[in-house]
A protein has these predicted regions:
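A short beta-strand motif characteristic of beta-propeller blades
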Residues: 10, 25-32, 106-114, 182-192
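Active-site cradle of extracellular carbohydrate-active enzymes
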Residues: 40-118
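Structural signature of eukaryotic scaffold interfaces centered on beta-propeller domains
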Residues: 24-59, 63-66, 117-131, 193-207
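Short coil/turn segments at the loop-to-beta-strand junctions that recur within blades
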Residues: 6, 12-17, 99, 117-119, ...
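Loop/turn-rich, solvent-exposed surfaces of beta-rich toroidal or solenoidal domains
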Residues: 114-192, 198-201
Length: 208
């Protein structure tokens, strides 16, 4: 890819900042804000709340460490980017000299309460038939959560205001909603599916 000039790359700064951060969690010093391990699943889709919208955005999900000793890793984190003018950021990939050309911040940063998972959303896929976003994970290990393998994020609903706790303080964030369907945990209200194969790949092909 370096010699053949087959692709261009864009640097995403926001996940790096969260990955490199050191925070206070339950009175202990922990590395990585929101337990960010980098980025993993990604997809293109319309804005949340506008499933019929023609404009497509890039959605990038964080990898999230499954550390069961911290309480700030029970949400999935998804960044939204408008890539219409990303041509100005595009640069050659040089693995020995990585560039820093890219947007300083995401257009939006969303949180989804799924409970603990192991390394966050492995595969994220927008399904045009339902208008929803499918998120496959490796199961979490906290017994207080149902630990599903697959979650469906409701694409018809706009993000709402919410509060999470990070670095020993409350933070106002944008929250996305899980779609109805599948199993619903009586204690947490979290909905999802037992579908371990989603972590190996997801590809909506239409028609439901």
């Amino acid at each position: 890819a370096e010699k053949e000039d087959l692709l261009r790359t864009v640097y995403l700064q926001e996940p790096v900042i969260d990955y490199e951060a050191t925070v206070q969690v339950d009175g202990k010093v922990k590395e990585h804000r929101y337990a960010c391990s980098g980025i993993d699943g990604l997809t293109f889709g319309p804005a949340f709340g506008d499933p019929k919208g023609k404009k497509q955005y890039l959605y990038v999900a964080y990898g999230v460490y499954g550390d069961t000793t911290r309480s700030d890793n029970d949400h999935q984190v998804i960044l939204k980017y408008d890539i219409d003018k990303w041509g100005k950021y595009e640069s050659h990939l040089l693995q020995g000299k990585l560039h820093r050309s890219g947007p300083k911040k995401a257009m939006s940063k969303y949180f989804v309460k799924t409970g603990n998972s192991t390394y966050g959303i492995q595969n994220l896929a927008y399904d045009a038939y339902t208008g929803n976003f499918y998120a496959a994970v490796y199961r979490g290990k906290k017994s207080i959560f149902p630990n599903y393998d697959l979650f469906v994020i409701d694409g018809s609903k706009k993000a709402t205001k919410g509060i999470i706790t990070t670095d020993n303080k409350a933070e106002k964030v944008e929250m996305l909603q899980l779609a109805n369907g599948g199993r619903k945990d009586a204690n947490t209200g979290i909905t999802g599916w037992v579908f371990p194969w989603g972590s190996t790949g997801l590809c909506p092909v239409g028609g439901g």
